[in-house]
Regions:
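Active-site loop immediately N-terminal to the catalytic Tyr-X3-Lys motif
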Residues: 34-40
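Short, flexible catalytic-loop segment of classical short-chain dehydrogenase/reductase
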Residues: 74-84
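A short helix-coil junction within the Rossmann-fold of NAD(P)-dependent oxidoreductases
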Residues: 11-20
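Active-site-adjacent segment of SDR/Rossmann-fold oxidoreductases
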Residues: 34, 55-68
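Active-site helix of classical SDR
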Residues: 9, 45
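Residue(s) in the substrate-gating loop at a strand-loop-helix junction
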Residues: 29
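C-terminal helical subdomain
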Residues: 71, 86-122
Length: 139
């Protein structure tokens, strides 16, 4: 999730920088919002992805590379990866998420948390003090 992502996005960035610009859209996750105890490595790599895209966007603007970025952060999506596992709250269909992704790219959004329910939840997560967050049981 970390090495492959940074290498792949780095290649795309350099290509667009050399060819007059472009649009890099990446699907990361809401898991990068805060450290999640049930999935520490996953949430850490997703936070890395969010920060890496933010840093590259800043670099692109300062160097006038004309590269746009869209960081797509879905919540739980009903895919084979999640089937047969524990109950996941606010599960979204792949159709719904795909439509939201297309809309975010067309609107050239910088960050798109899919969907409104997850946007509200992650907003709240960001405002929970760390001394409280440490004691919240997520699993």
């Amino acid at each position: 999730n970390a090495t492959g992502f940074t290498r792949m996005v780095g290649v795309a960035y350099r290509y667009f920088a050399e060819h007059g610009g472009g649009h890099i859209a990446c699907i990361t996750s809401i898991a990068g919002t805060k450290g999640l105890g049930p999935a520490p490595a996953y949430s850490a790599t997703k936070a890395l992805q969010n920060t890496y895209l933010q840093a590259l966007e800043q670099l692109s603007l300062t160097k006038h590379h004309n590269i746009r970025f869209t960081d797509i952060r879905p919540g739980f999506v009903d895919t084979p990866l999640l089937s047969g596992t524990a109950h996941f709250p606010m599960l979204m269909t792949t159709n719904h998420v795909a439509k939201c992704i297309i809309k975010a790219i067309r609107q050239r959004r910088h960050v798109c948390v899919i969907d409104t329910r997850w946007r509200i939840l992650t907003f709240l997560w960001r405002h929970i003090p760390d001394w409280i967050w440490r004691h919240i049981r997520l699993a």
